[in-house]
C-alpha cells in the first residue's frame, strides 16, 4: 500500500519514495543488508522500467528518487531479459521452459502462455509494483537469514510526486543525500557508502545516469555538463541546503528553550547559531504585536482579510525565506487560515515558495493584492 495520490499513477513523473522499518528498529544495521537492498532496488528498477535517479539507505529507513516513464511495448524476449535481471538466469530459464511447454499443448496452452506474459507486463511501469518487489524481497531474505517473524516494515510506504522542474528535483535529491550528514553517519557529502552520491563519485553507471537526468540542463555553449561540473553544482546545493537545515535546527532549539524545555546543542549547531535564532524569534514576536494592533483597527471582515494579506506580504518582504510556521507566529492566525491566504496570494502571483514546504519570497513579478 501507499499513501500517495492518484498522481503517482501518471507517467513521466518523478517520485520521492520513503519507507521505514517497523518500530524504528535498526534492521539495516549490517552493511551487507544495505548492500543487498541497493542491489535489489537496482534489479527491481530494471524489471519494472523505473529509472533510478538517486537513493540513500539508512539503518531504519530508505529514500529513493525515481522517474516513471511512459510504458513501451515489451515483447517476450524483453520480458525474459528483465525477468532474468530480477530472478537470475535460472529464474528466466524456468519461465522460458514453462512457456515452451504450454505452447506444445495447442491453442489453450498458447493462450495460457500469453496470460503469463501479460502478468509480467502488468507488473512493469508501476511505482507500486517496484516498491512491492523491493520490500517483499527484503522481508523474505531478512526473515530467512535471521529466523525473524512478524512485521518488518512500518505500514505503507510514502510516495510524493515531485514537481517536474529542475529546482524541485535537485532539491529533493539534495535532501536525500543530506540524510547521512544530518544523522551524523558521515562527515562529508560523499562519505556515506549507501548513498547514490557516493556511488556517483565512485563512477557507478546507474548513479551517474541518474545525476545526468537530474542535472540535464545544457551549458551556455550547448554542451552536456561534465561529471566534475555536476559534482560541483550538487555540492554547492548540498552546502546551501545544509546551512538552511542548521539554521532551522538552531531555531527549533531556541523555541524549545523559550518554552522551558531542555534542548542541548547537537553536532550541527552552535550556541552562537541558537543565540542568533533567539534574537530573530524576538524580532518576529515584536512584529507580530505591531501587526496585530494594525489588524484590530480594520473594520469589516473583507477589510481584515485584506489587512492580513498585506501583513503576509510585508512579513515576507521583511524576512525573505520565512517559513509558514513563522508566519503563524507573526500573524496569530490558524494554520488552515494561513494556508488559505498563502494559496490565494501564490495563485495571484504576489508570492512564491522555495519548493514544497520551503520558505516564502515576494514574487519576482511583484504583483500586489
Residue ranges and their predicted role:
Residues 1-59, 67-355, 364-369:
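Short Pro-Cys-Gly-centered "Cys-loop" motif that presents a nucleophilic cysteine in a tight turn
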Amino acid at each position: 500500500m501507499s499513501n500517495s495520490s492518484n498522481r503517482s499513477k501518471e507517467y513521466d513523473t518523478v517520485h520521492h519514495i520513503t519507507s521505514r522499518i517497523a518500530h524504528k528498529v535498526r534492521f539495516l544495521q549490517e552493511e551487507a543488508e544495505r548492500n543487498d537492498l541497493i542491489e535489489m532496488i537496482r534489479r527491481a528498477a530494471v524489471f519494472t522500467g523505473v529509472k533510478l535517479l538517486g537513493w540513500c539507505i539508512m539503518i531504519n529507513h530508505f529514500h529513493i528518487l525515481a522517474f516513471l516513464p511512459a510504458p513501451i511495448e515489451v515483447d517476450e524476449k524483453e520480458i525474459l531479459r528483465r525477468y532474468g535481471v530480477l530472478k537470475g538466469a535460472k529464474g528466466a530459464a524456468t519461465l522460458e521452459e514453462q512457456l515452451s511447454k504450454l505452447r506444445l499443448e495447442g491453442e489453450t496452452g498458447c493462450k495460457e502462455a500469453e496470460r503469463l506474459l501479460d502478468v509480467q507486463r502488468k507488473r512493469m511501469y508501476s511505482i507500486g509494483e517496484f516498491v512491492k518487489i523491493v520490500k517483499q524481497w527484503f522481508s523474505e531474505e531478512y526473515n530467512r537469514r535471521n529466523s525473524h517473524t512478524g512485521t518488518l516494515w512500518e505500514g505503507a510506504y510514502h510516495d510524493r510526486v515531485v514537481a517536474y522542474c529542475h529546482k524541485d528535483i535537485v532539491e529533493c535529491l539534495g535532501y536525500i543525500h543530506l540524510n547521512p550528514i544530518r544523522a551524523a553517519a558521515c562527515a562529508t557529502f560523499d562519505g556515506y557508502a549507501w548513498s547514490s552520491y557516493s556511488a556517483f563519485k565512485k563512477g557507478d553507471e546507474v548513479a551517474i545516469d541518474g545525476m545526468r537526468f537530474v542535472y540535464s540542463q545544457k551549458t551556455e555553449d550547448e554542451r552536456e555538463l561534465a561529471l566534475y561540473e555536476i559534482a560541483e553544482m550538487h555540492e554547492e546545493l548540498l552546502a546551501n541546503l545544509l546551512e538552511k537545515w542548521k539554521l532551522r535546527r538552531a531555531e527549533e532549539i531556541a523555541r524549545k528553550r523559550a518554552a522551558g524545555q531542555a534542548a542541548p546543542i547537537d553536532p550541527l549547531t552552535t550556541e552562537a547559531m541558537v543565540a542568533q535564532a533567539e534574537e530573530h524569534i524576538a524580532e518576529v514576536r515584536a512584529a507580530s504585536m505591531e501587526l496585530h494592533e494594525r489588524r484590530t483597527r480594520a473594520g469589516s471582515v473583507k477589510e481584515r482579510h485584506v489587512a492580513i494579506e498585506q501583513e503576509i506580504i510585508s512579513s515576507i518582504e521583511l524576512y525573505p525565506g520565512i517559513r509558514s510556521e513563522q508566519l503563524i507566529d507573526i500573524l496569530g492566525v490558524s494554520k488552515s487560515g494561513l494556508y488559505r491566504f498563502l494559496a490565494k496570494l501564490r495563485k495571484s502571483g504576489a508570492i512564491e515558495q522555495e519548493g514544497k514546504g520551503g520558505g516564502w519570497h515576494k514574487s519576482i513579478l511583484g504583483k500586489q493584492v
